Amino acid sequence: DKGVHDCIKADGVEIEIFNDQIIYEPGFLRTGQDNPFSVFTPFKRRWIENFDMKFLDIDFDYPIKDKLNFDSNVENFDFGLSATHGVDMSLWPVGEISALDRVKDFLDNKAIDYSKNRNDPMLDGTSRISPYLACGIISSKRCILEGLKKNNFELSSGHIGITKWIDEIVWR
């Protein structure tokens, strides 16, 4: 990111950088000895101590730039993975709307039992959103917001399955 920023800035293009997908800047939460956390419980405690609901504001009012003038249909794009890698592309439909639908479906139908079902491969007990998070299609910020809405805005109480899922998104 820094290399791209420097290149574009050198060409005289103004760039504004902001963290839209995370709650805290990397390295912000540190131990009392000013080290990165290596254990979840103290990390989560510090995370909650510093948390403010305003961190979850998702501003949808940014000006929309003119779209590029070409047709694109990613949904029908052949990545060539199915034949060579045996990947069922229907498992992860393309796009942010599909990712958000998956999060909401998980929270509505599976999250209550998540803490007991998440480690059993025989059960379909997980959210299956890792690819969406890894690719930046949906943010951990958005997932936490949706989880909190479903859990009456409770981080540490409420439905144990939802709090466990939020814990794992926080640690991610």
What does each of the following model-derived ranges do?
Residues 1-55:
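Trp/Phe/Arg-rich N-terminal binding region typifying the photolyase-homology
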Residues 42-172:
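Glycine/tryptophan-enriched, flexible segments
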